[in-house]
Curated annotation (Swiss-Prot):
Keywords: Cell cycle, Cell division, Coiled coil, Cytoplasm, Cytoskeleton, Microtubule, Mitosis. InterPro entries: HAUS2 (IPR028346), HAUS2_metazoa (IPR026242). One of its GO terms (cellular component) is HAUS complex. Its main location: cytoplasm. Belongs to the HAUS2 family. GO terms for biological process: cell division; centrosome cycle; microtubule nucleation; spindle assembly. Residues 54-84 form a coiled coil. This is HAUS augmin-like complex subunit 2. It comes from the Eukaryota. It is found in: Cytoplasm, Cytoskeleton, Microtubule organizing center, Centrosome; Cytoplasm, Cytoskeleton, Spindle.
C-alpha cells in the first residue's frame, strides 16, 4: 500500500473531515443521512444561494440595466418625440399614452438609481445569518452598557446628595466651633460625655 504524499494538500485530513469520520465510525451519521440533509438544504436554498440561479438573476438584471442605460441615452430625443410626435419619426404608440411613457421613463430612472442597492442586497443574502448574529451580539452589549450607565447615574446622584448634605452641615459645624472658641468651651474628647461635664469645665 503506497504511503500518502505529505506534500499533497488533498491527502492531509482537516478538522471537519476528522470529526465527520468519527461520527460515521460511531454510527451517529451515515452516508444516506448526509445525502438527505444536503438535498433538503439544497432544495430550501436553491433559489437564493445556488450559484446557477444567482448567475441567472444577475445576468437578467445586467441585461435590463444595459437596456435601460441605452434608453436613457436617448431620453431627451424620446421625450421630444413623445411630446411632439413628428411625421415618420413618432413611436408606434397612440398619442393618449404618450404622457404615460414619460412617467414610465421617470420610473426607469429611479429603478436604475436603486439597482446597485438591490444587487448589493442580493449579494449579502448568503451572509444574512452571520450579520444577524453580529447584530444580536451588538444589541446584547448595548443592553449591558445601558445597565452600567444607569447604575453609574444612580451612584452619581447618591454622591451628589451626600455632597449637598455635607455642604449644608459645614456652616453649622463652623458656627458651633466659633461659638465654642469664643466662650472658651472645651469639648470632651469622648463623644458620649454628658452635658453636665461640659458645664462643669465651663464653670471652672
Amino acid at each position: 500500500m503506497a504511503a500518502a504524499n505529505p506534500w499533497d494538500p488533498a491527502s492531509a485530513p482537516n478538522g471537519a473531515g476528522l470529526v465527520l469520520g468519527h461520527f460515521i465510525a460511531s454510527g451517529m451519521v451515515n452516508q444516506k443521512n448526509l445525502e438527505i440533509e444536503l438535498l433538503k438544504l439544497e432544495k430550501d436554498t436553491a433559489d437564493v444561494v445556488h450559484p446557477f440561479f444567482l448567475a441567472q438573476k444577475c445576468h437578467t438584471l445586467q441585461s435590463m440595466n444595459n437596456h435601460l442605460e441605452a434608453v436613457l441615452k436617448e431620453k431627451r430625443s424620446l421625450r421630444q418625440r413623445l411630446l411632439k410626435p413628428m411625421c415618420q419619426e413618432n413611436l408606434p404608440i397612440e398619442a393618449v399614452y404618450h404622457r404615460y411613457m414619460v412617467h414610465l421613463l421617470e420610473l426607469a430612472v429611479t429603478f436604475i438609481e436603486r439597482l446597485e442597492t438591490h444587487l448589493e442586497t442580493i449579494r449579502n443574502i448568503p451572509h444574512l445569518a452571520a450579520n444577524l448574529k453580529k447584530m444580536n451580539q451588538a444589541l446584547a452589549k448595548m443592553d449591558i452598557l445601558v445597565t452600567e450607565t444607569e447604575e453609574l447615574a444612580e451612584n452619581i446622584l447618591k454622591w451628589r446628595k451626600q455632597q449637598n448634605e455635607v455642604s449644608s452641615c459645614i456652616p453649622k459645624i463652623l458656627a458651633e466651633e466659633s461659638y465654642l472658641y469664643k466662650h472658651d468651651i472645651i469639648m470632651p474628647p469622648l463623644p458620649f460625655t454628658s452635658k453636665v461635664h461640659v458645664q462643669t469645665i465651663n464653670a471652672k
